[in-house]
Amino acid sequence: MTLRLLEDWCRGMDMNPRKALLIAGISQSCSVAEIEEALQAGLAPLGEYRLLGRMFRRDENRKVALVGLTAETSHALVPKEIPGKGGIWRVIFKPPDPDNTFLSRLNEFLAGEGMTVGELSRALGHENGSLDPEQGMIPEMWAPMLAQALEALQPALQCLKYKKLRVFSGRESPEPGEEEFGRWMFHTTQMIKAWQVPDVEKRRRLLESLRGPALDVIRVLKINNPLITVDECLQALEEVFGVTDNPRELQVKYLTTYQKDEEKLSAYVLRLEPLLQKLVQRGAIERDAVNQARLDQVIAGAVHKTIRRELNLPEDGPAPGFLQLLVLIKDYEAAEEEEALLQAILEGNFT
């Protein structure tokens, strides 16, 4: 019934039902502002939308609302339910016809590759271009061949078109077009869940949305771990830019964060950095003092207390920057590993 209501409502407004949503289960007492607030939170992954109207349904003793979208969207992005005043609201959506969707995406992909459907058919091992519609094949024979084509091309088709993430920089005063962290994180998390692509492609799309300090954080993490996952990237951004502890609690946490047994010094520095950047963001540490603050805590928290001497850092010299410190530590760790390997070889020769 609700899908039919969506179709009839859209027909009465001369609009495409696949560019609209019906929100059902809304409390009678819910105001327009409360509906808008719930839509803003629940429909963030869909991009732009507009509340077009409301209606009371006597059989449910509830309101329904019609929401217009700027374009047809993927079924994977549309939530089945969203939280609203008085409980959970149902989201009714008329998905695109799967055959038409696949064929349009297939044709678009082939056009970009300079291929025809007939050439694709031959590439898949079908003689005489049997996938080509002009061959006059009966519809029943298309199904298995289309399924094979879909399986072969699915990775490329998934990457062909996607909604880009909103932009986030982590700057204290976001520039025009940039989101504040909370809204950006919610939207990004929802979008990433919906993407049916490999993690490496998700990470590429995530990096595409980052600017300024936020991009710098992920670049540094990638230097230490080139295979860092999207979830790890989001966790790091949450630690640096998310609103959590007050400055005093954060400072105590920073000063009591020590290197763990068997933990590499470089890993400790990377674990410490998000806390330090939070303190800088909240004004607890001046930006021009951040390098010295980092070095002081690394020396205080390291398992080996001779680390300053091991890294050849003078007592009265300027503290190295983050990347410079990591390079020094990496070189030190590499030298230690090489020495341990040589020692093991020598011991093996004399036993």
UniProtKB/Swiss-Prot annotation:
Keyword Mitochondrion: yes
Record-level GO BP terms: apoptotic signaling pathway; autophagy; extrinsic apoptotic signaling pathway in absence of ligand; extrinsic apoptotic signaling pathway via death domain receptors; intrinsic apoptotic signaling pathway in response to DNA damage; positive regulation of apoptotic process; positive regulation of autophagosome assembly; positive regulation of release of cytochrome c from mitochondria
MF terms in GO: ubiquitin protein ligase binding
InterPro entries (UniProt xref): PNMA (IPR026523), PNMA_C (IPR048270), PNMA_N (IPR048271)
Effect of residue 120 to E: Weakened interaction with BAX, resulting in a nonapoptotic protein
Sequence segments annotated as region (BH3-like): 120-127
Residue numbers covered by motif LIR: 49-52
UniProt keyword Mitochondrion present: yes
Family the UniProt entry places it in: Belongs to the PNMA family.
Record's protein name: Modulator of apoptosis 1
Native organism: Homo sapiens (Human)
